[in-house]
Amino acid sequence: PALSHALDRRVFHDFFQQAAKAVASKGISIALPLSVAGLSSATLVNELLEQLENSPLPARLLHLIIPAEAIFDHAESVQKLRLAGCRIVLSQMGRDLQIFNSLKANMADYLLLDGELCANVQGNLMDEMLITIIQGHAQRLGMKTIAGPVVLPLVIDTLSGIGVDLIYGDVIANAQPLDLLVNRSYFAIN
């Protein structure tokens, strides 16, 4: 936990010191991981919110990716981040559908499907049914679904047919360093 906590602190410190201004000037959203150890630390959460408050980046552009199971054990921290305007992305949404027995509307903004679940969805009826179930729960809860990384066009067709809201991966665009994106790319929509 101490290593994860230190890594979270370093990621946020480096982002706010080196990239937040450029990201804000482009008006693009950024998704950064937040570990369970970081989420459980009131000090780290407060530091994150302080850095956000002192940066030009609007909170609505900061998406925090947290493991899905952490939302219940650390609901207070998650709610604090959401009230500050941050978007919450629950990751590792996969075969364990029990989470939907406790997940309520307004607990998160996005559900990030497990990459393994999406990888061969075009040829696996069970994975397709699981994604369809997750998509239905997401709609009921007012959340958007994110799938990826996608490397085959056929997977995009299948995921789009299911109704997945957002898809990422090399078939959409090659991964690029953040510095390259904010300093050399053009964006038309904020």
Give short role names for the model-derived ranges.
Residues 35-40, 61-72, 86-190:
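EAL-family c-di-GMP phosphodiesterase catalytic domain
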Residues 47-54, 76-84, 129, 133-134:
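Catalytic-core regions built around general acid/base machinery
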Residues 5-76, 149:
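Catalytic core of bacterial c-di-GMP phosphodiesterases, primarily the EAL and HD-GYP domains
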Residues 1-2, 6, 121-125:
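Short, contiguous acidic/charged loop-to-helix segments that flank catalytic cores in large enzymes
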Residues 26, 55, 84, 140-141:
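Helix C-cap/helix->beta junction micro-motif
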Residues 28, 56-58, 77-80, 112-114, ...:
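A short alpha-helix capping/helix-coil boundary motif
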